[in-house]
A protein has these predicted regions:
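Cys-His-centered catalytic/binding microenvironment captured across papain-like cysteine peptidases
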Residues: 25-41, 136-141, 152-232, 355-414
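Short acidic, glycine-rich loop/turn motifs
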Residues: 9-13, 134-138, 200-202, 335-339, ...
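Feature for long, exposed domains in two main contexts
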Residues: 1-24
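Long, hydrophobic alpha/beta structural blocks
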Residues: 243-247
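Oligomerization/assembly interface segments of phage tail-like spikes and tubes
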Residues: 44-51, 58-77, 184-206, 237, ...
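Active-site-adjacent core segments of small-molecule enzymes
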Residues: 56-58, 249, 383
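Autoprocessing Asn-cyclization modules and mimics
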Residues: 74, 78-163, 207, 221-227, ...
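Charged, low-complexity interaction regions that mediate assembly/partner binding
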Residues: 24-31, 36-60, 66, 73, ...
């Protein structure tokens, strides 16, 4: 982003030296208003081919997602004038956009000529060959190029040109373009603000990971969602209608089972949780990947002791035998015990023992005795994918963020 060149003209009597310094990129130095969250949007692109029976073939069309940052900012006085001037003059060009949630304070004075910056880099968006913005206010900043990243420091490609106080902040930065339309409502002759959206110029890669737990060869979602506000379950069918417009209509349930859509909300309260969530999203790659997703609800209630070695259990009557027996999406269960153990089983048969009890057979016998009081929850386990290629994280601070995912159950033969 910076220009640092020396031109030398070699004359017979003397040399003429011309030093040129400058910058090819301008940083966006107007911080967000943290009273509303800073939105990070990751967007993959998946080609989904659906068969008659609702089974799918899916392929990723992007190696890495596009990323978008969106936030509100407010200006007053000289800052307002500079913000409007910069938006006017540089609006169509590329900005160095600070990644606001990943900033950290220097903590100690950084002298001019420094090539190493002691700073916390763990789980922040610093990358070798990328940019960093040293910042104190919209008018006092320096854009630096990162040569390498260590756990507790950055090594710069060129020395700093100014001395920075301990209170200065340093942010990782990404090249981005602002949206083609920027609204700047003016509250008075001195105050203005608006909502600003930036699309990163290049996709951003991340190390994918789904966790260690698997079932039938596929990863399992093991983190519970945030129940504040609840989450919705929607059942939709691939129902074809034949209507000749002259008599009764004919319907064909092409898939035989509904596609369930569950919306789950997540509250991430540390950078480690944010990192694990991002790794999961990158492993799924939007609608491309799939994993086993529990309903996290009390779907079956144990009513009798399960003996060690038994391959069935008695559950409170809920219509499973009549309505669900063997259906894809309702034949796998997650059994959570009070001691922390989690068991995964496939239901292979069901019979009504009485008007209040159903006996369900499973594929793998239980290796120890389980009392009804030992069971915290029995939930259905569904193979599902994300229902959208775009996922947003709402950052309230650098360490706290919220997100939501909608899972779509799949027709499968696992």
């Amino acid at each position: 982003p910076s220009i640092a060149a020396v031109f030398t003209w070699d004359f017979l009597q003397y040399d003429l030296v011309l030093t040129i310094t400058g910058s090819r990129v301008i940083p966006w130095t107007f911080p967000p208003d943290w009273s509303s969250p800073v939105l990070e949007r990751l967007e993959w692109k998946t080609d989904v081919l659906e068969a008659f029976d609702a089974s799918e073939q899916r392929g990723s069309l992007r190696l890495a997602p596009r990323k978008r940052w969106e936030f509100e900012a407010f200006f007053e006085g000289r800052v307002r004038r500079y913000a409007e001037a910069a938006s006017w003059g540089w609006g169509a060009r590329v900005w160095a956009l600070p990644v606001w949630p990943d900033g950290a304070q220097l903590g100690a004075q950084l002298n001019a000529g420094a090539l190493s910056v002691p700073i916390t880099t763990t789980l922040r968006d610093y990358v070798a060959g990328g940019l960093a913005v040293i910042y104190t206010d919209p008018f006092a900043y320096e854009v630096a190029e990162i040569a390498s990243v260590a756990a507790g420091s950055l090594t710069l490609a060129r020395a700093t040109t100014s001395t920075w106080p301990a209170t200065a902040w340093i942010y990782p930065a990404r090249l981005a373009r602002i949206a083609d339309r920027v609204a700047l409502p003016r509250w008075s002759g001195q105050a203005s603000g608006g909502r600003f959206a930036f699309e990163l110029v290049a996709p951003v890669d991340y190390t994918p990971a789904t966790g260690a737990t698997t079932y039938r060869g596929r990863p399992v979602l093991t983190e519970r969602p945030n129940w504040i506000g609840g989450y919705d379950l929607e059942l939709s069918r691939k129902l074809a209608e034949l209507d000749a417009m002259t008599g009764a209509r004919v319907y064909d349930d092409e898939s035989g089972i509904p596609a369930g859509r569950q919306r789950m909300r997540w509250t991430l309260t540390s950078r480690a949780e944010q990192d694990a969530y991002r790794r999961l999203l990158y492993a799924l790659r939007g609608r491309r990947g799939s994993m086993w997703v529990p309903t996290w609800t009390d779907d079956l209630v144990l009513v009798a002791t399960i003996a060690s070695g038994a391959s069935n259990f008695d559950a409170e009557w809920s219509g499973y035998t009549r309505q669900l027996d063997g259906d894809t999406g309702r034949r796998d269960v997650r059994i959570e015990l009070a001691n922390g153990a989690i068991l995964y089983r496939r239901i292979t048969g069901a019979v009504e023992v009485s008007a209040t009890v159903e006996r369900l057979s499973v594929d793998t016998a239980f290796s120890f005795t389980i009392q009804p009081a030992d069971v915290v929850q029995v939930s259905f386990l569904t193979l599902a994918r994300l229902d959208s290629d775009a996922i947003e994280l709402a950052h309230w601070t650098g360490d706290v963020s919220e997100s939501s995912t909608t899972w779509r159950s799949m027709q499968h033969e696992l």
